[in-house]
Amino acid sequence: MLGAMEGVLLSVATSEALLGIVGNTFIALVNCMDCTRNKNLYNIGFILTGLAISRICLVWILITEAYIKIFSPQLLSPINIIELISYLWIITSQLNVWFATSLSIFYFLKIANFSHHIFLWLKRRINIVFAFLIGCLLMSWLFSFPVVVKMVKDKKMLYINSSWQIHMKKSELIINYVFTNGGVFLLFIIMLIVCFLLIISLWRHSKWMQSNESGFRDLNTEVHVKTIKVLLSFIILFILHLIGITINVICLLVPENNLLFVFGLTIAFLYPCCHSLILILANSRLKRCFVRILQQLMCSEEGKEFRNT
């Protein structure tokens, strides 16, 4: 039975999950409709669609597992169920970070201004960059899956007294957690480097504009600032997401603590919910579609009120 605080936090987490699903579904649908209309899925559209779909899957996995764990934990008793959930979580979470990193690199290569020959070479060969990122993703899966298999096969993840518990030392749990998310950390570090380089590019561009004393509206600076805001928001929200997931992993060492588990879930769902909204507002095409839908909804509501009067 959930307490009052646990019920409130679970309601908040569920609302965040639903908003995340709606926002990411909107992003995926808009890009798919553009692909159907133009008979071509361009790089940014493919990345945004993949990011949205991976987040939708991630949210469904987390919220389904959470509700089962809280209300019907006995459903998780078969070993193959928890193994399947672990595999799905690894695939979707790492795909999600891969698409987000690819998006940041795509913007970086399109927007940043550097004269270094390595940057210019990468800018002309963006497909090679994406191939390298795919290699990082595959290597991450190669390291992650054996760790989960070993934990399950060694019976270190057991269903006891109506709850899942991990039977290992805290140091061993931390090591396994790091190995499982090694690819995520690598991609996240790449994103931090990209964000840092974009800030340097913005600073150099601003210094150049000041030296020229240009009074014209600088669109390049606006694009730089907008992109940096999106990247920084992703970094902050993803750190919160990792903290929330870590709290949920710790709950396996502290059984029967639903309050801590639901609190971690609430923090974890901030990322797919808020960042999808940020992407919609930052992308002019998505923003136009979003505003158009809101206007149509408002007009339909006004029409209903007019007919009722």
From Swiss-Prot:
Keyword Membrane: yes
Glycosylation sites recorded in the entry for this protein: 161
GO cellular component, one term: membrane
Membrane topology (Cytoplasmic): 29-43, 109-127, 204-233, 281-309
TM spans (from-to): 8-28, 44-64, 88-108, 128-148, 183-203, 234-254, 260-280
Transmembrane helix among keywords: yes
Signal peptide boundaries: none
SUPFAM superfamilies referenced in this protein's UniProt entry, alphabetically: Family A G protein-coupled receptor-like
Record's keyword terms, sorted: G-protein coupled receptor, Glycoprotein, Membrane, Receptor, Sensory transduction, Taste, Transducer, Transmembrane, Transmembrane helix
Highest taxon of source: Eukaryota
Membrane topology: Multi-pass membrane protein
Main localization category: membrane
Molecular-function annotations in GO: bitter taste receptor activity; G protein-coupled receptor activity; taste receptor activity
Side Extracellular, residues: 1-7, 65-87, 149-182, 255-259
Protein location: Membrane
Known role: Putative taste receptor which may play a role in the perception of bitterness.
Other noteworthy facts: Several bitter taste receptors are expressed in a single taste receptor cell.
Similarity comment: family membership: Belongs to the G-protein coupled receptor T2R family.
Name used for this protein in its record: Taste receptor type 2 member 114
Upper classification of the organism: Eukaryota, Metazoa, Chordata, Craniata, Vertebrata
Gene field: Tas2r114
